[in-house]
Amino acid sequence: MLFVIGLVFGSFLNVCISRIPRDLSIVTPRSRCPHCHAPIAWRDNIPILSWLLLQGKCRHCQRTISLRYPWVELLVAVFFVTSYAYFGLGWTTLKACLFCFLVVGLILMDAETGYLPAEFTYPGILLGMLFAALAPGNASGLLFVLAALERPVPAGPRWLSFIDAVSAALLGAAFFYFAWAAYYLIRKRHGVGFGDFAMMAMIGAFLGLRLTLLVIFLAPILGTLYALLTLLRSDRRQVAQAQPSGDGAVLLAEVPFGVFLGVSSLIALFLGRPIWNWYLGFFR
């Protein structure tokens, strides 16, 4: 049942991915073929099944429909089922499903358009903080900070979890602000978009301090590896531009960093605990 619900949400996410970056309504008009713009009948809009029955083509113009549509539906469904398997029945699973929905959407919109819409990130920040109170998570990061500062611990797990979420959102946004400022001072150009600030704040609100630190660590590593592999495997003229400097030409590649924030946050959501335990094992 949860898999089917995930397919439906994945289908809706496809609408968001296609329309929000173009500033179009996600309610009207009804779904249309991206090529001939013919309205898609309900029988041709069943997640995955319709795409398979039509062999990935529009019923009207017979042009190919992107494989992205069934893949997004399947991916969201898999994340929903994985969330239930990992967290069990409860608010935490609902929180994880919502987080996966938002993050998958942001990853694909950033990859396709370089746009991280406020329609996803701003409500995501508020929802992350709300769920922190409804489904208190592991606030060990905040407890460590409070102990180091010799400050009292807030009464009750809900308050502790909420403050942990707010602190993580502020930490995520602050990290990118200082990274943006440092890059601008050195290079005199913007290296991080403001959408990344909001996305990182949203991730912090959902994951809390401990896992947000893991995302801050993982995302630059993944981004750097991607940039290096792209430069090594592709024609430099297609992925970079030369910029003069004191040492000669510097090769700069455009990297959609929201993609790596999203991937890192999903890794942290499902594998963050064993990764932290592995890391802390070196100090025992």
Residue ranges and their predicted role:
Residues 2, 98-228, 278-284:
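Functional transmembrane core segments of multi-pass inner-membrane proteins
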Residues 7, 11, 15, 81, ...:
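Transmembrane alpha-helical segments of multi-pass membrane transport proteins and ion-pumping complexes
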Residues 13-69, 248-249, 257:
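Membrane-proximal soluble regions of multi-pass membrane proteins
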Residues 21, 230, 234, 271-280, ...:
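Membrane-helix cytosolic exit motif
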Residues 32-35, 57, 143-158, 238-249:
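Membrane-interfacial, low-structure loops and terminal tails that flank and connect transmembrane helices
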Residues 56, 75-81, 102-104, 197-204, ...:
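Hydrophobic, membrane-inserted alpha-helices
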Residues 85-95:
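Transmembrane helix-loop-helix
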Residues 194-195, 232-267:
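Interfacial loop-to-transmembrane junctions
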